[in-house]
């Protein structure tokens, strides 16, 4: 399963911090953030089903804006 999100995570330091936090909760997932894309795209890929809301809640708690892209 792959989910893609639009974020306001625009710098590498913040992206690395968010990725580390998400990897703690989802260690088996592949997680990337493209800070050079205009939408600062977060891509989460896992072998099992997962909730977009869980990912979004974690990012919102860190103070960032996130929106699932369809």
Regions found by a protein language model. Name each.
Residues 37-43:
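Surface-exposed aromatic
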